[in-house]
């Protein structure tokens, strides 16, 4: 009887320790600078840097996102978008099942594992996708968007982006007196697309990339 009690207590102690360690692992998840880079290309890099690193694209095109004119470069299941004016990387979209993120987060990853790596987030519905959206703490204009299977919560596709995610964000960005990296391009494209007089809009001045470097 005593042995059974000791075994039971030992089992419960092990379970408690496991739960504590698991909870700590989840709590430790957080966004890092590396989460806004893929295969050596980071949001904010020059278009030329992309081409030097990845070579010739499979296809090239243009598109408008919330009134912002973009150039797009497709490399297999990866689509990289740059601003048409500034030629800076502002969006990296990962599709298919071959991509790998930090700590091997990939297609099919569960929500619990995503939380362990990136931290917890509330589900949102955006562009016909259920998703988790993570902001970079030091740069609110860089975000990681993880699109999920709506039924099971498994990871489908990924976006690393500096683009506004809604029309409201675009309008706010266009009217902002402050101009973080690439936002000047956004403002001009958006206002011109709305046929608003832009003659009084100040010229873009050299700015710091997210507060780092010159």
Regions found by a protein language model. Give the residues of each.
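Bacterial N-terminal signal peptides that target proteins for export
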Residues: 1-11
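Bacterial N-terminal signal peptides
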Residues: 10-20
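Sec-dependent signal peptide cleavage junction
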Residues: 22-29
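Short, flexible domain-boundary/linker segments around small modular repeats
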Residues: 31-33, 55
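Second-shell loop/turn segments in exported
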Residues: 34-40, 98-105
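A cross-family detector of function-defining hotspots
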Residues: 42-85, 106-214
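A low-complexity, Ser/Thr/Gly/Pro-enriched, surface-exposed linker/loop concept
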Residues: 88-100, 107-112
